[in-house]
Swiss-Prot record:
SUPFAM superfamilies linked to this entry: Zn-binding ribosomal proteins (SSF57829)
HAMAP family in alphabetical order: Ribosomal_bL33
Gene3D superfamilies: Ribosomal protein L33
Record GO terms (molecular function): structural constituent of ribosome
PANTHER family: 50S RIBOSOMAL PROTEIN L33, CHLOROPLASTIC, LARGE RIBOSOMAL SUBUNIT PROTEIN BL33C
Name of the protein in question: Large ribosomal subunit protein bL33c
Assigned keywords, A-Z: Chloroplast, Plastid, Ribonucleoprotein, Ribosomal protein
Classification of source organism: Eukaryota, Viridiplantae, Streptophyta, Embryophyta, Tracheophyta
GO cellular component terms, A-Z: chloroplast; ribonucleoprotein complex; ribosome
Principal place of residence: plastid
Keyword Membrane on entry: no
């Protein structure tokens, strides 16, 4: 059986540009990616450059709070 305290967890990455535009009311949506990370190797929040299909460019995506 699978261990409940598994080192790998599923996380969501959200576009930081869309979050900033969302507060001003001009956002067409919010770009989210899902991925898995190992908590033992990467204990800090994950930040990656990913393509945002709402901004139409590569932007910084940060791990969201759950």
């Amino acid at each position: 059986m699978a261990n409940t305290k598994d080192a790998r967890v599923t996380i969501a990455l959200e576009c930081t540009s869309c979050i900033q535009r969302k507060t001003s009311g001009k956002s067409a949506g919010l770009c989210r990616y899902t991925t898995r990370k190992n908590r033992r190797n990467t204990p800090a929040r994950l930040e990656l450059e990913k393509y945002c299909f709402h901004c139409h460019k590569h932007t910084l995506h940060k791990e969201s709070k759950k």
